[in-house]
Amino acid sequence: DIRTPMNAIVGFSELLEKNLQNEKKAKEYLGKIQSSSNLLLRIINQVLEMARIESGTAVLQLKAEDMDALFHRVHTVFEEDIRKKNLQYYADLDIRHHYVVCDQTKLQEIMLNIISNAIKYTPEGHSIYVEIHEAASENPSKIHYIFSCEDTGIGMSEEYLPHVYEEFSREHTSTENKVPGTGLGLSIIKSMIELMGGSIQVESRQGIGTKFTIDLSFDIALKEEVYGSE
């Protein structure tokens, strides 16, 4: 959702304006603005990729990436939205292999979309728990990650769950008009995950919350492949 990094840019720009005399805070806010701006650019580029996914011409742009850095960038984008809604937000990265070969843009968009949905549909003061943990892999050159996002939001009805990945599908609830969105996100995200050879599952109960779980496998990379020789 383009609004997510835009909200972060606007929010941190306002904080920067109020703290121009504080060099440490100003530098911190500038870094967050830059990070959110880069993510916004990637999302705009992803809009073009959406057409490729639907036409069957999408390909993975693979290179070595640092999962710690990617995880941090994603969460930075949501800091302002989390603060405004006073959400209890927990993020846990529990992995042994931190460098993998992946399509950074698509993987980042998957995380952004899932977490953004949780924030949208979780009322003020409620909680969201995001985790990436490493699971056993039979192939020593590959790593298996499980990404999960669980919220205590409004949830979805049992009748709607089979349709959650359909294009333009949004459940007709009393909150629908209050929450922006096109209904395209999850359909595209599922296509991206399947392009990577992974899977996505959803569990939800109306009035209790929703949990998305994503399984993905990647080739293991070395730190030198990400940052070069230091």
Where are these regions (language model features)?
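Short alpha-helical segment of the dimerization/phosphotransfer core of two-component systems
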Residues: 35-40
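Helix-loop junction within the histidine kinase core
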Residues: 51-62
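Conserved catalytic submotifs in the C-terminal HATPase_c
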Residues: 61-66, 83, 88-98, 133-135
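Short helix N-cap motif at coil->helix boundaries in the Bergerat
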Residues: 67, 155-163
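Short alpha-helical Gxxx[C/S/T] motif in the catalytic ATP-binding
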Residues: 180, 185, 189
